[in-house]
Amino acid sequence: MTDKYKERRFDTYGYEKIDKEVLESIEYEYPEKNTIVEYITNEFSSVCPWTGLPDNAKLTIRYIPSKKLVELKSLKYYLTSYRNVGILQEHAINRILDDLVELLQPKFMEIIGEFQERGGIATRIVAKYEKEK
């Protein structure tokens, strides 16, 4: 029996398709407080860089704002830009953290990616940033 799937592959895009420029921020009126802001979506997806198969995840973005909040529509477009990008799960979560920290300069930020099982293994990635004191 031959492996008819051995050479099968779906096209993927490179990192240049991640649309960081779509991200926008809005001013935060309570920078003196340590309010925790949390966004959760079950719709995050990227693709495996080797097979092109989808990697779907629940994504939690948790942060303590300094002077800015992320504008939610821009966040949705940004996250959707990962849809056909071939990127490792661990790299995607760290890239999201880096891009949001650059935009918002928060006091603290944590990105959690809970990826659906593949091959019987579920992956949970936690990337953190804390502003130096």
From Swiss-Prot:
Membrane-spanning segments: none
Pathway: tRNA modification; tRNA-queuosine biosynthesis
Top-level EC class: oxidoreductase
UniProt KW keywords: Cytoplasm, NADP, Oxidoreductase, Queuosine biosynthesis
MF term (GO), any: preQ1 synthase activity
Domain of life: Bacteria
Catalysis: reaction(s): 7-aminomethyl-7-carbaguanine + 2 NADP(+) = 7-cyano-7-deazaguanine + 2 NADPH + 3 H(+)
PANTHER family, per the entry: NADPH-DEPENDENT 7-CYANO-7-DEAZAGUANINE REDUCTASE
General function of this protein: Catalyzes the NADPH-dependent reduction of 7-cyano-7-deazaguanine (preQ0) to 7-aminomethyl-7-deazaguanine (preQ1).
The protein, known as: NADPH-dependent 7-cyano-7-deazaguanine reductase
Organism the protein comes from: Thermoanaerobacter pseudethanolicus (strain ATCC 33223 / 39E)
Upper lineage: Bacteria, Bacillati, Bacillota, Clostridia, Thermoanaerobacterales
Primary gene name: queF
